[in-house]
Amino acid sequence: MGLWGQSVPTASSARAGRYPGARTASGTRPWLLDPKILKFVVFIVAVLLPVRVDSATIPRQDEVPQQTVAPQQQRRSLKEEECPAGSHRSEYTGACNPCTEGVDYTIASNNLPSCLLCTVCKSGQTNKSSCTTTRDTVCQCEKGSFQDKNSPEMCRTCRTGCPRGMVKVSNCTPRSDIKCKNESAASSTGKTPAAEETVTTILGMLASPYHYLIIIVVLVIILAVVVVGFSCRKKFISYLKGICSGGGGGPERVHRVLFRRRSCPSRVPGAEDNARNETLSNRYLQPTQVSEQEIQGQELAELTGVTVELPEEPQRLLEQAEAEGCQRRRLLVPVNDADSADISTLLDASATLEEGHAKETIQDQLVGSEKLFYEEDEAGSATSCL
């Protein structure tokens, strides 16, 4: 009886009791509220989610190194294939472009985007070598200046000499100034010290253009002095010769008696020869005033030992006498019949001592002062008497 009082479960209710989520008598779902189940679900989600994220990022990490390795390999290949000296690598095409002669250059293999510009020499510098595609311009200081590490930007003028008590041991170069050393140290090393007056170098003397003008003026003055001195020397010699000949230097007081000595076969002249000899003697005894030009010519001839003759009547008569083969010799005889041995001995001694010029001068002086005269004897010899 009691069994009939209980309700029999139906089929629907039986199916509901088999599935989860079936409600209990109180109407709740006990498995959703269980904290153990919730923890388990959270743990599973927390573990599986990072694993999927890591698996998704692994291919991307593999791709990044591949992208970064490519530029490094490219740089390595470019370094191995550098452009040669005298060219550069184009940043657009990557090809090697040559530099321009005289404009830019490169001195070694490179991958520069452009060539280096050539250096332009500054003021005070000279171009030692021009710029090429593989070499820069080489500049150096002009002569008389230098450039060292203390003045790399400009050339400085070299010193022209050393201070007092020092001597120069090396000249100025484009890279250094003159070098000086103590005089005592230079003498101890065996080098001859320079004098104090010669400290100034030739370079310093020629630095000013006025020195050339001074040298030219000095040469002209020296040449003028030589010319004037040579001209005055001739006149001075002529004046001295006039004084020595007894004329007092004046041409109007200078008298010359020219005579010759000819050697011919001696013979006794006839009456006609005696008359001609007397005529010649009279002509020679007459003082002849000659011009200044003739006197100078005679004096110059006397200096050289040459007999000077007047190309007039005496010359013609002498030539005529020579054609007849006569011999005439003049002797100096005193006018007052004094002994002529002393005078003749003096004249012969002068001739013996090779002073023929002095002998002729003495004869001319004595004849001009009328202390002697020429006399011709019958044997054809002429005697000059005092």
From Swiss-Prot:
Residue ranges occupied by any Death domain in the UniProt entry = 340-366
Q: Which cysteines are joined by disulfide bonds?
A: C83-C96, C99-C115, C118-C131, C121-C139, C141-C155, C158-C172, C162-C180
Where composition is biased (Polar residues), the residues are: 64-75
Question: What superkingdom heads the lineage?
Answer: Eukaryota
Q: Which UniProt keywords apply?
A: Apoptosis, Disulfide bond, Glycoprotein, Membrane, Receptor, Repeat, Signal, Transmembrane, Transmembrane helix
Q: Which InterPro entries match?
A: TNFR/NGFR_Cys_rich_reg, TNFR_10, TNFRSF10, TNFRSF10_N
One example GO MF annotation: transmembrane signaling receptor activity
The places in or outside the cell where this protein is found are: Membrane
The protein's recorded glycosylation sites are N127, N182
Region named Disordered: 1-25, 62-90
Membrane protein topology class: Single-pass type I membrane protein
Question: Is the Transmembrane helix keyword given for this protein?
Answer: yes
Q: Which PANTHER family match?
A: TUMOR NECROSIS FACTOR RECEPTOR SUPERFAMILY MEMBER 10B, TUMOR NECROSIS FACTOR RECEPTOR SUPERFAMILY MEMBER 10D
User: What biological function has been recorded for the protein in this entry?
Assistant: Receptor for the cytotoxic ligand TRAIL. Contains a truncated death domain and hence is not capable of inducing apoptosis but protects against TRAIL-mediated apoptosis. Reports are contradictory with regards to its ability to induce the NF-kappa-B pathway. According to PubMed:9382840, it cannot but according to PubMed:9430226, it can induce the NF-kappa-B pathway.
Protein name according to UniProt: Tumor necrosis factor receptor superfamily member 10D
What is the native source organism of this protein? Homo sapiens
